[in-house]
Amino acid sequence: MTSIDSSELEKHTPMMRQYLTMKAAHPEMLLFYRMGDFYELFYEDAKLASELLGISLTARGKSGGDPIPMAGLPYHAVEGYLAKLVQIGQSVAICEQVGDPATSKGPVERKVVRIVTPGTLTDEALLQEHQDNLLAAIYQGKVGFGYATLDISSGRFVIAELDTQEALEAELQRTRPVELLYSEDFSNLSLINHLKGIRRRPEWEFDFDTSVNLLLQQFGTKDLHGFGISDARLSLQAAGCLMQYVKDTQKTALPHINAIVRFNQADSIILDAATRRNLELTQNLSGGREHTLAWVLDNTATPMGSRMLQRWLHQPLRDNNIIASRHNAVAELIEANLFDELHQQLKSLGDIERIMARLALRSARPRDFARLRQALSLLPELQHTLGQCKTPLLTKLAQLIGEFPAEHELLENAIVDSPPMLIRDGGVIRSGYHSELDEWRALSEGASDYLTELEAREKQATGISTLKVGYNRVHGYYIEVSRLQADKVPLSYQRRQTLKGTERYITPELKVYEEKVLSSQGKALALEKQLWDQLFDLILPKLNELRDFANAAAELDVICCFAERAESLHYTQPQMVSKTGIQINAGRHPVVERVSSTAFIANPVNLDAKRHMLIVTGPNMGGKSTYMRQVALISLMAHIGCFVPADSAVIGPIDRIFTRIGASDDLASGRSTFMVEMTETANILHNATSQSLVLMDEIGRGTSTYDGLSLAWSAAEYLALQIKAMTLFATHYFELTQLPDLIPGANNVHLDAIEHDDTIAFMHAVQEGAASKSYGLQVAALAGVPSHVIQAAKHKLHQLESRDNQASPAVASAPQQQSLSLSPAPMMGEKALNKLTTINPDELSPKQALDLLYELKKLAKS
């Protein structure tokens, strides 16, 4: 807590002193301070909220002699404002009135009852339905980094030990945390400054012993050996900081966080940050979801299934046994035609994973219980369908999903069919669930019958025809008589209120009944809230089994989704083998084929130990990048258990996928396009193995022709000779097509085009051999370059080709692609001019001068 100078506090009003004290306890957050029907913000908080939320900035009197900046928002609209703030990385402390204004001397007692941060959300209205909501922490050691993530909305807690900055960058790209904690000593700020929701934390929160003790306390264990993480020192320090932060913000027990998992990179195909970005797995290059692999594949029935699919896409497996179990399950659902039936059943489950987290945190609302009841009611039908399945994975999932008849019966008996949003005003517990509650409700709800009976009885006893019995919130129950008949009222009537033309009375009997009814309403509500709390106690012992059910249902959802996609999009089951190589027959790009207005041209690829590098040439827009990406995407899809867009596919082991495709300046780090390109190339050359899949596109284009060709040649040569990685190397340097003649394992393939007059038609079909032309000018014309510029370029190209043909007769036997020539084109007559500058005319004989004139003419023509 930030200390406050007591002398400074004395300058302010009592209310403002209360505010400043609470703000000092939460200096890094916006403080929503409850004032009647509004939340108010003051000083810098008010200015920031006004800017971020577009609300009016005003002033609220003076305190300490200066106007106080103030902004306010209605309490009933707070959830919408909170959603906006957490989406941009802001945290909020919500301060409520907890005292009674009627009995308070001075400011009403207030307390921070809720802290909302981007990484600790559980409220359904604030969460992104189809995305994990991860809180993360980084700790930097002398060698390497510790990284931990926690999804409080599911309880999933994962740590990773990372050796390099590149590995950390890849993890940040894979997990995309919405809030990130880092220590005061963290030095690689350029890695995280672009992220939203970064929080600097004191070094003591990362203390190793403190972290271990926090985790042991949370898990209720004597040591961490059972989790296999005892040696993960750096990541345990990060995990400890996470636990401290969550405990500070949630202010409640966290029983659903009862395990921690170590992420082992060796279990999955490693994808660096550039590869995840270039392949557009779950996020396109513009930051959206459209036209990504997830956009094509995600036809899941539940939000939790959608989130699991995205995790799978970022973590393709290497264990062929697990992969095969998924493929076989998908195949069975297709063969038995069960995927659609299961999809419809799963659709009604909702987001059980997040409901269970809210139950564990005791923040669930009545409708969460109703949704859980609905989900449990569907399990017998779901189990009947799964009973037709025989594959081991589907059988295992059926066992984990299970059935919960006792819990379903409890919720059926306890919760009304359509409960209100909040327990606050009651009406949640079903009649018949608890006899005492029914009695108190009967007293309250039976008032109408009693008042009708009392009115009839009093009319008869008094003979007053205008007598009525009524109720209002200010005066309670009353007997109303017209003033003309007021002289007939019995002495037992006590005047309560005089109105124009009427008098209102209370009787001892009515007074007793009033107290009884009002008391019954309060007691009914208090008892209902007590029964509500007991429901948590009755459900939570089954928390672990219910979480297993949610996780298994999500996995079943993804498997059903794979089956539906395979059937609808004509995917085929890949064959996973132990021999290195990739053989794909008639492969298709899963995204491009879905968005293309024309039929997609399928293409093969064949990579193995004797053919591990393909030099890919062809025109711009001919499909080189699409071809390379589809090889990577098909391989990745196979490794997550999905069928693939191809007639057939045989996929061997892959340890990493690298992509060096496209580039842009990294202005934040001061790196040029070429520097980014070379950094990514260096990463590939240092880390690729013979089991890596490498996509290299246009290496060397960001520098001079000679430098670029030299770098491209050397990189390709090193990949082919030393690493022997499975490589697709696209280039416009035609000289690289000579590599297959010099290096075993390298081969040429190309994508061709047909030229007619000034137009060009791209064939998009991959063929063996090198391309003969790049069609650069034709593509420029298609791009809208002015025709006079194209004509000038053709003239210049003709001059350069003529020069190169004369200067390089030795390569006439090679396929000609002069637009790819390395030789820098000299200015016309440059050689003749250079020759002239070396001549001394006074020393030439007439015969020498004549010979020199012919030579200069010849040079000028060249």
From Swiss-Prot:
InterPro entries for the chain: DNA_mismatch_repair_MutS, DNA_mismatch_repair_MutS-lik_N, DNA_mismatch_repair_MutS/MSH, DNA_mismatch_repair_MutS_C, DNA_mismatch_repair_MutS_clamp, DNA_mismatch_repair_MutS_core, DNA_mismatch_repair_MutS_N, DNA_mismatch_repair_MutS_sf
GO biological process, one term: mismatch repair
Ranges of Low complexity composition bias in the record: 806-824
Gene3D superfamilies with a match to the protein in the record: 1.10.1420.10, 6.10.140.430, DNA repair protein MutS, domain I, MutS, connector domain, P-loop containing nucleotide triphosphate hydrolases
Highest taxon of the lineage: Bacteria
Disulphide connectivity of cysteines: none
Keywords associated with the record: ATP-binding, DNA damage, DNA repair, DNA-binding, Nucleotide-binding
Pfam families reported in the protein's UniProt record: MutS_I, MutS_II, MutS_III, MutS_IV, MutS_V
Protein family: Belongs to the DNA mismatch repair MutS family.
Protein name stated in the entry: DNA mismatch repair protein MutS
Lineage summary: Bacteria, Pseudomonadati, Pseudomonadota, Gammaproteobacteria, Alteromonadales
Gene: mutS
